[in-house]
């Protein structure tokens, strides 16, 4: 099975400006993400960006870079432009790996591509990991996902879902029962689907939650979720996240 990885990266992050280039253990964050993608066994790894500073740094450490428009609302829109520019075929599998996931395990990247390859009727797959800590469940920077019995996503939110009507009133004594999952910022797409995604308007829930994947559910699409067998550390959204990742390295 062959697959490619595209890493969308922008400089003007709202919560942590310039985070793609912040130093982590002597390397810019985007390089750590790139190296994880290389280790996954991908046929090709490309960084898609609209920023010349990111392009220069990426090319300096040997990455292939595709320059894109600065008008995109999401990473999915950015990689869709890159996939067309690079001439990828409709049936090829592209993994969209966000540029703020420096701790993503390489085997998780490959597993996601394999999951999409094994499900011929699925156009989008993504990754989640069980939530084991109450603080993470109630952290608004952590995206939660609710699954159906076949591991398709029902909804994504920054809110703690599913809501425990009878248990959440006492957070100090709350015991999680394995029914809560954190969404990990990585997707696998069939290239042909990306063109379909671009034809859809952003939906109200997507705008309210600032979660691009809700556009897929709103328009009747399905996202098959792979539940990670090993812990996938959260990405970098805030200064606190950055210090946590630096401590890890």
Swiss-Prot record:
Main location class: cytoplasm
Q: Where in the cell is it found?
A: Cytoplasm
NCBIfam families (UniProt xref):
kdsB, PRK05450.1-3, PRK05450.1-5, PRK13368.1
Question: What keyword terms does UniProt attach to this protein?
Answer: Cytoplasm, Lipopolysaccharide biosynthesis, Nucleotidyltransferase, Transferase
Cite the InterPro entries for this sequence. Cytidylyl_trans, KdsB, Nucleotide-diphossugar_trans
Q: Which gene encodes it?
A: kdsB
The protein's name: 3-deoxy-manno-octulosonate cytidylyltransferase
What's any GO biological process attached to this entry? Answer: CMP-keto-3-deoxy-D-manno-octulosonic acid biosynthetic process
Q: Which reaction does it catalyse?
A: 3-deoxy-alpha-D-manno-oct-2-ulosonate + CTP = CMP-3-deoxy-beta-D-manno-octulosonate + diphosphate
Quick one: which pathway?
Nucleotide-sugar biosynthesis; CMP-3-deoxy-D-manno-octulosonate biosynthesis; CMP-3-deoxy-D-manno-octulosonate from 3-deoxy-D-manno-octulosonate and CTP: step 1/1; Bacterial outer membrane biogenesis; lipopolysaccharide biosynthesis
- EC number of the protein: 2.7.7.38
Lineage, top ranks:
Bacteria, Pseudomonadati, Pseudomonadota, Gammaproteobacteria, Legionellales
> Can the keyword Lipoprotein be found in this entry's annotation?
no
By sequence similarity, the record places it as follows: Belongs to the KdsB family.
EC top class named in words: transferase
Instruction: Please give the function described in this protein's UniProt entry.
Output: Activates KDO (a required 8-carbon sugar) for incorporation into bacterial lipopolysaccharide in Gram-negative bacteria.
Give any Gene Ontology cellular component: cytosol
Recorded GO MF terms: 3-deoxy-manno-octulosonate cytidylyltransferase activity
């Amino acid at each position: 099975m062959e697959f490619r990885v595209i890493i969308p990266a922008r400089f003007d992050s709202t919560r942590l400006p310039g985070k793609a280039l912040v130093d982590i253990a002597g390397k810019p964050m985007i390089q750590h993400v790139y190296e994880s993608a290389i280790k996954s066994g991908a046929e090709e790894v490309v960084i898609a960006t609209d920023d010349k500073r990111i392009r220069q740094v990426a090319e300096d450490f040997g990455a292939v870079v595709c320059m894109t428009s600065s008008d995109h609302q999401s990473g999915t829109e950015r990689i869709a432009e890159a996939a067309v520019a690079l001439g990828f075929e409709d049936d090829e599998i592209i993994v969209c790996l966000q540029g703020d996931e420096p701790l993503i395990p390489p085997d998780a990247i490959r597993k996601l591509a394999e999951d999409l390859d094994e499900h011929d009727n699925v156009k989008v797959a993504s990754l989640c990991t069980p939530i084991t800590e109450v603080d993470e469940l109630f952290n608004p920077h952590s995206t939660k996902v609710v699954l159906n019995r076949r591991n398709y996503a029902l909804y994504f939110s920054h809110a703690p879902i599913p809501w425990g009507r009878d248990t959440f009133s006492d957070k100090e004594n709350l015991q999680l029962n394995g029914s809560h999952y954190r969404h990990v910022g990585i997707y696998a797409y069939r290239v042909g689907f990306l063109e379909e995604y671009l034809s859809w308007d952003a939906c109200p829930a997507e705008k309210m939650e600032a979660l691009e994947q809700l556009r897929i559910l709103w328009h009747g699409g399905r996202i098959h979720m792979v539940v990670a067998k090993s812990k996938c550390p959260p990405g970098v959204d805030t200064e606190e996240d950055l210090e946590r990742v630096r401590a890890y390295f």
